[in-house]
Amino acid sequence: MRERASTGRIYIQHVDHCNSHSAFNSKLATIRQSNLCLEITLPTKPLNNIDDKNGEIALCTLSALNLGLINDLHDLKELSTLSVRALDEILEYQNYPVVCAKKSAISRRSLGIGVINFAYYLAKNKVRYSDGSAKNLTHKTFEAIQYYLLKASCELAKEKGSCSLFNQTNYYLGKFPIDTYKKDIDSICNEPLHLNWNLLRKKIKKYGLRNSTLSALMPSETSSQISNATNGIEPPRGFISIKSSKDGMLRQVVPEYKKLKSEYELLWEIPNNIGYLELVAIMQKFVDQSISANTNYDPKRFLNEKIPMKQLIYDLLVAYKLGIKTLYYQNTRDGAEDNQNLNKSIENIKEDNCTSG
């Protein structure tokens, strides 16, 4: 924990949660590790050499739904169908230089569909990370996402057949994430299920699923720029984000700043990690892989500006208690100014090289 606090880069995976609350039957397909950003939890097997057909390299094909464009949860039905069908087709077109990677990708057909613009979505709906007001909305939203993703994959299985290793999933056994989630979540959110899961369960039992997994919440640090969206599920650090790359610097303003500036909850305005972690746990109730979630600390909130180990351990135990599978960065506020002169900065952001037509 000291190393995580000082570097921010000791990442945490609760492997027991990754197997007990998994898309896979842990007796047949054990989860042993994750990827760099910690949203992927897929089975792997060691290989003796690059041509070893008995090994398994996990591959997951990703996409994200822009929650900022969602006005009605029924909109997610068509979006989920398009996402599942598009990503499933990509699996056939990709080049696989390693045989045990191709075997995994084609036989499991694992997808990881996440979200971007969650902070904007909360602001639009006038709810916040820290005070519990976003819990029910988050529950309803991620229930709809997982339901429609599974429905789309089941319909695709009806057309093309289920993935060849579908029998290694919990879905094959009739066990869904809503059956295996950590029940401590019920103590923080009592929102009921709203969709017809029993009917979907019967259809999946009959037709199977085209894909072993459907959901994973990735950081979307770079890809969110294309849609001028806030990163993944994260609160923005400021109304203006400055992102650097090999192509230069990009200044990005949160969506609908002038209309919603009083509704956004910025990262360092959030008093502690608990409200955020509770929302992550509610998402994890439905997500069948994992979530790239962070913890954040402002030293100025603590005595002598030193974050006590007691606080770090407490947050870790809260995450574990609520069934959170993985924790990515530990961010510590470094004193840099997050909010520039907003009115002046926003006026000066122009598309200097943009031509019409």
State where each predicted segment sits.
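Structural signal for hydrophobic packing residues in well-ordered secondary-structure cores
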Residues: 1-5, 66-69, 80-98, 119-126, ...
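Function-dense linear segments that define catalytic or interfacial modules
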Residues: 4-105, 115-125, 229-232, 236-264
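Acidic, glycine-rich active-site loops and adjacent beta-strand->loop/helix elements
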Residues: 17-19, 142-145, 172, 299-301, ...
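Short Asp/Glu-rich motifs
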Residues: 23, 141, 338-339
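Short glycine/threonine-rich loop-to-helix capping motif typified by GTGT followed
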Residues: 26-27, 110-117, 146-148, 175-185, ...
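Catalytic alpha/beta core of large soluble enzyme barrels
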Residues: 38-44, 87, 91-92, 190-194, ...
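Alpha-helix capping and helix-loop boundary segments enriched in small/acidic/polar residues
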Residues: 49-54, 70-78, 101-113, 125-144, ...
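Internal maturation/activation junctions in enzymes
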Residues: 80-102, 128-220, 292
